[in-house]
A protein has these predicted regions:
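Alpha-helical transmembrane segments of integral membrane proteins
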Residues: 2-6, 100-133, 179-329
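Hydrophobic alpha-helical segments of integral membrane proteins
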Residues: 3, 11, 51, 55, ...
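Residue-level signal for discrete positions within transmembrane alpha-helices
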Residues: 14, 99, 103, 139-142, ...
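Hydrophobic alpha-helical transmembrane segments of membrane transport/permease proteins
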Residues: 18-70, 160-189
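Transmembrane helix irregularities
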Residues: 32, 144-147, 266
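An internal, D/E-rich "acidic patch" concept
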Residues: 61-119
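Membrane-water interface segments at transmembrane-helix boundaries in multipass membrane proteins
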Residues: 139-207
């Protein structure tokens, strides 16, 4: 299969998957118990049956389901998700846009750091299979890989910002920056990084184990290939075999997992942001669930799904460029 045809097929699959997600997103929030109009007016002086009926009509919920879907599809394609119930009067697109920056900073930097550390540990553990370093690193990475992010986050919060650990006030307990602080330039950057440190550390440790284990197993598989034995028989130095022949071939599976995890890390970021009160999309998701903010939840669900689909698409395309055998299959 040619490169263009392969990419076109993957793009088509991604678009079909995204279309399915849009349909699922529409029906999901219509089978959840609760009347959106009543939720919007609850707690206000205007909460009465007449006003609920009027709001139901304004939201278009009194129309037949096929007509509702057509309106929903048109609004979704134009990124019009309506107004938030939780943040009254604010457009969902604007709310998400304000929160996406902190989450992208957290997810992008933690992914790069965890991938780098995981690859290094996995390479040396696989190359020295059976050594003390291999056994010790496997135990550590398996532990952090199986550890829930929220539980580890609570421990880190207690140790470094909760007032009861060995370093009770080393870092802020939460937030994105110091409230009311008039900072600019390096002072602002330093303040943001100080608040980022603890949630960043939790995500790095949580995902480093996965990358390390995959890299180690992939490296061991490549070491059993015939070309490695041939290189050794020719007298090629061990370091040269490792870095020029084994590592490049072993990187492909790990590379794919790292790209795919860019989408799934948003899931881990939800719990971590909630623990540290970090004002990103994760904390916003929890707040939207608590308040049953259907328009906001629809926008967030679509965004998270699109992130996974796009990451999967990029991984498929780049993998096919690195390994042409994928296109042939």
């Amino acid at each position: 299969m040619g490169t263009r045809r392969y990419i076109a097929s993957k793009v088509l699959q991604a678009l079909l998957t995204l279309a399915f997600v849009m349909v699922f997103n529409f029906f999901l929030f219509r089978v959840i118990p609760g009347d959106p109009a009543a939720l919007l007016l609850r707690g206000t002086a205007a909460f009465n049956p007449q006003n609920v009926a009027e709001v139901t009509k304004e939201l278009g919920l009194d129309k037949p389901l096929p007509q509702q879907f057509l309106v929903y599809a048109q609004d979704t394609l134009t990124l019009n998700f309506g107004d938030s119930f939780f943040l009254k009067g604010q457009d969902v697109k604007t709310v998400i846009g304000e929160r996406i920056g902190p989450t992208m900073l957290l997810v992008a930097t933690s992914t790069i750091a965890s991938a780098a550390l995981g690859l290094i540990i996995g390479i040396y553990a696989g190359w020295r299979r059976g050594s003390r370093f291999d056994v010790g690193s496997q135990g550590f990475t398996l532990f952090v890989y199986s550890m829930p992010e929220f539980w580890f986050g609570i421990l880190v919060l207690m140790a470094f910002a909760g007032g009861i650990g060995p370093f009770p006030s080393l870092f802020p307990a939460g937030g994105y920056s110091t409230p009311g602080a008039d900072l600019s330039g390096f002072g602002h950057v330093s303040d943001v990084l100080n608040h980022l440190a603890l949630p960043w550390f939790v995500l790095v440790v949580a995902y480093m184990g996965e990358y390390s284990l995959i890299m180690r197993n992939s490296l061991i598989d490549v070491m059993n290939d015939d070309f490695v034995m041939t290189a050794r028989a020719k007298g090629v130095r061990e370091k040269q075999i490792l870095w020029r022949h084994v590592v490049p071939n072993a990187l492909l599976p790990t590379f794919t997992v790292v790209l795919l995890s860019l989408g799934f890390i948003f899931g881990g970021a939800i719990t971590v942001e909630y623990v540290f009160s970090y004002p990103g999309l994760g904390l916003l998701t929890v707040q939207a669930i608590d308040s049953k903010d259907f328009p906001l939840l629809q926008g967030l669900f679509l965004l998270f799904s699109a992130a996974v689909i796009i990451a999967n698409l990029i991984a498929d395309i780049l993998y096919s460029r690195l390994d042409p055998r994928v296109r042939a299959g």
